Structure formats: C-alpha cells, structure tokens
Amino acid sequence: MSSSLVEVREPPPRRPWSPPRALLDVNVWIALLDDAHQFSEEANAFIESPEARIATCPLVENGVIRIMAMPSYSRGGGLPMSLVRQRLQQACASLDHTFWPDDVSLRDDTLVDFSRVQGHQQVTDLYLLALAVRDGGTLAGAARA
C-alpha cells in the first residue's frame, strides 16, 4: 500500500489545458451561498476563475442543505431548505459543474489507506478526497480554525 491516504488511479481523459475538477466541500459551498460568511470572498474568487471546474456529490449537497437550514445556523436562524436547495441549483447551473455519485467505499483497501487516518474528524474528508481522486479531480476545502 502506498504512503498516501488515497491510491491514485488513472484519471478519466480531459483536455490537456483543463485544470482538474474540484470537488467543493460543504464549507466552501456554504461560503459561496452565504455572502455574510467569513470566507465568502475567497470562495467566490475561487469559482470566478475562468478555469474553475467544479463537482458536487450527494454527501456535500445534503450537508449544505442540512447545515444552512439548522435553526442555529446564524443569528437569524436557519434558511428554508427550499431556498438553500434553489441557491445550490442556481449555482451549479451557472458554473462548469458535474455531479459525482457517492459510489466509493472506505472499506476498499485498493482506494484508501485507512491506517493513516488519525481521528474521526478526518473520515468525511478522506471519503471526499477518495471520490475526487477516483474521478480525476481534487478536493477543495475551507481552512478550519
């Protein structure tokens, strides 16, 4: 098993001048959809690049809706789920977006080296990274304080 967390498989073919597609994590999406978010400016600068190519998956989409609809999301409370869903739909439609199904497993030793996971807080990121690498992309996440 390699020393990295994820075994790199042959990526799908892409145009040589295209950057890898970025699977945006929940934190990046929240920053994109909420102008009051502390990282909104950085997230928007990332996707406004002419080369920006993004991806979502069910895990990320569900997480965005769940978190932004929580009553404790902001001082004003959560947003209506239908509004968050609509914003997500509009953003995906306006960007170079593709949808990646959640179809990798952390039980797959050919895809991940689970022995390198140091704690429970890395499990979701490991899964998203495995999905992105398997599909020839990268994982774009917001820095956590």
Explain the meaning of each model-derived region:
Residues 20, 24, 66-68, 106-109:
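Short, basic/glycine-rich phosphate-binding loops at helix/coil junctions
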